[in-house]
Design a protein with these regions (language model features):
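Non-catalytic, mostly N-terminal accessory regions of nucleic-acid modification and defense proteins
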Residues: 1-202, 261-270, 378-381, 405-412, ...
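Helical mechanochemical/support elements of P-loop NTPase systems and associated helical scaffolds
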Residues: 5, 9, 27-30, 139, ...
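Conserved Class I SAM-dependent methyltransferase catalytic core
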Residues: 29-43, 191, 246, 250, ...
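Hydrophobic alpha-helical scaffolding
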Residues: 133, 152, 238-242, 281, ...
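Short acidic (Asp/Glu) and glycine-rich catalytic loops that position anionic groups and cofactors
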Residues: 141, 259-263, 302-305, 344-349, ...
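Conserved S-adenosyl-L-methionine
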Residues: 177-284, 288-301, 349-352, 356-364, ...
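Conserved catalytic motifs of ABC-family nucleotide-binding domains
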Residues: 288-291, 295, 299-325
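C-terminal, active-site-flanking charged/polar segments
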Residues: 369-373, 383-447
């Protein structure tokens, strides 16, 4: 299926959401559940059909012999699950009884769960009764017919893309609430591009996993880099406190053939995976600025206190308990402590955390001195449905090269985005690659840079010459030597900046270092600002502004004189 055909299929399927919005007796923020459930049902149906000939052949070849095997056992081996006949999509779609359609869908999902214990409680069985309103009993049948149009020869991996497309559209339609379960795919893809997860016997944690998008994008990265043979050894561990979102995540992993566990729990108070020093990768987009976390329940937890403990705030009233007024640094500490000695992490965090003071500053200072923070990236505003302000990406690496131990790479990406609509932005594929190559160059991987330039040259010949030549120019203007260099307004490697004496006491702080900037991790403090139109230096810009202000004052005085003269002339002309 070509990209154009897939886009058309997604758009056609999205029509099902329009149908539900217009006629279903269901809250606006709930119609995603039945549609995502039908996507899974159609996925299971097509996947089973694609394996059924092999399943039947295996079963019939051994039937009646000493090696005879149960039919369901062969199904699980070849397909991953057994699909009972009542769950066949044709059986549901072809039923003439439109009023009973909801019951058929419910029974199909219940049968799938009964036959496949790992799916127990995952499918949204109970919502379909609301999709057969008395005034339009054929509503659900219309939606089912739309999903029947998915071709049965579709590449099964495309179901994951379809599911992700719907998650993204539902998140956009729900606005702020949508951001609680979905992180925009292009942001996640960039995060994955930086930490470069490797297949094999690796463990991957997301303690605020939402619908599981971090896991899915990591798996797709491995697929793009030809690591499918080892991908099934890669295991994901997610924690999510919202029951409905847990179901979304479990379906997402199944649709994308990702092995993992999703646990319903509150990560502040529960540690279902004993997550201290054991994970190869941690990625997450946790909720920002959470308050009212009970201080006594987290202050002695190793996940949160290795680098210092964020401050508790005493509540008001006789029985009030001490709480953490802002849990951002609980999350940040959690990600750092969950990593093993070679682990890497990427997380989305509120911009304010980069400069937070008090105990949070101490935690940040200790992390910086420990040499585990590799990179900080300021994102553009309007990249998320839940917040309009820019967020920051933190990248940890417990196994940084020795030459990087005393420095951090800062990237200011606030001006790198593609506008979706008035209120939303994203990264294009090329923007993800261009930002990712900065990290590759910082790591000394000049080969990756050359390969990207060559990729763009090939696409300039085959596809859009002007567009891909502009991408080449963007890279070569900033990195003309095909190696990393600081670029004003974009990226800068900054030293931690503490010079110690023989007794490990601080004897000097380097100018413009991180220590000199009060341990701030705000990229804007370091990368500087370039005036693209005139190329002026900061000093030249200040001088230009000074002379412009003097000119402004002169013009203002002239304007006042003219205003007085005009008023006088009008008065003489027309009288009082």
């Amino acid at each position: 299926m070509t990209d154009a055909e897939l886009k058309k299929l997604k758009d056609d399927l999205w029509h099902s959401a329009d149908i539900l919005r217009s006629g279903a007796h269901i809250a606006a923020n709930k119609y995603g559940q039945p549609i995502l459930g039908l996507i899974f049902l159609r996925y299971a149906d097509i996947l089973f059909k694609q394996h059924k000939d092999d399943i039947d052949k295996e079963y019939n070849s051994k039937k009646g012999g000493r090696n005879e095997r149960p039919y369901k056992e062969i199904c699980v081996e070849k397909c991953g699950f057994y699909l009972p006949e009542c769950a066949y999509f044709d059986f549901i779609n072809d039923s003439p009884d439109t009023a009973a359609k909801a019951d058929l869908v419910k029974k199909a999902m219940q049968a799938i769960e009964d036959e496949n214990p790992r799916l127990y409680g995952v499918l949204p069985k109970e919502v379909y009764g609301q999709l057969v309103p008395e005034e339009e009993p054929e509503l659900l049948s219309r939606v089912v017919r739309i999903f029947k149009d998915i071709p049965e020869n579709i590449e099964i991996d495309l179901f994951g893309e379809i599911y992700e497309f719907f998650l993204g559209e539902f998140a956009l339609s729900e606005g702020k609430d949508g951001g609680t379960f979905y992180t925009p795919a292009t942001v996640v893809r960039y995060m994955v591009e930086v930490i470069k997860p490797e297949a094999g016997e690796k463990k991957f944690l997301d303690p605020a996993c939402g619908s599981g998008g971090m896991f899915v994008q990591a798996a797709r990265y491995m697929h793009r880099h030809n690591q499918d043979a080892d991908r099934m050894q890669f295991r994901c561990y997610g924690v999510e406190k919202e029951p409905d979102t847990v179901k979304l995540a479990k379906m997402n992993l199944l649709l994308n053939n990702v092995r993992g566990d999703i646990t319903e729990a509150n990560s502040f108070y529960s540690d279902p995976y004993d997550a201290v020093g054991v994970f190869d990768y941690v990625m997450a987009n946790p909720p920002f600025n959470v308050d009212e976390v009970l201080y006594d329940r987290v202050k002695d937890d190793k996940r949160f206190n290795e680098y210092g403990m964020t401050k508790g705030t005493k509540g008001k009233g006789k029985d009030a308990k001490e709480t953490v007024s802002n849990a951002n640094y609980l999350w940040i500490s959690y990600f750092a402590t969950a990593l093993n000695e070679k682990g890497r992490a990427a997380l989305v965090m509120a911009n304010s955390a980069s400069d937070a003071g008090s105990n949070d500053l101490i935690i940040r200072q200790n992390m910086i001195k420990a040499g585990i923070i590799k990179q900080m990236v300021t994102l553009p505003s309007n990249m998320f449905t839940s917040v309009t302000l820019p967020a920051t990406l933190w990248f940890f690496d417990k196994n940084k090269p020795e030459k990087q131990k005393n420095e951090i790479l800062f990237i200011d990406a606030r001006n790198i985005f593609t506008q979706i609509d008035r209120a939303h932005r994203k990264f294009s594929d090329e923007q993800i690659k261009n930002l990712g190559i900065i990290t590759r160059l910082y790591d000394g991987d000049t080969k990756a840079f050359d390969e990207l330039i060559e990729e763009y040259r090939t696409k300039a010949v085959r596809e859009n010459k002007e567009y891909f030549e502009s991408q080449i120019n963007w890279l070569l203007e900033r990195f003309p030597e095909h190696k990393y260099q600081d670029v004003i307004g974009l990226c800068k490697v900054t030293e931690i900046g503490e010079v110690l004496d023989d007794e490990r006491n601080v004897k000097e702080i380097l100018e413009d270092s991180i220590a000199d900037q009060d341990w701030s991790l705000n990229a804007g403090r370091y990368v500087g600002v370039v005036i693209e139109d005139d190329g002026m230096t900061e000093e030249e810009f200040k001088e230009h502004m000074k002379s412009s202000y003097i000119e402004y004052e002169k013009l203002s005085d002239t304007a006042k004189d003219l205003e007085t003269a005009i008023a006088k002339n009008l008065k003489e002309l027309f009288g009082d």
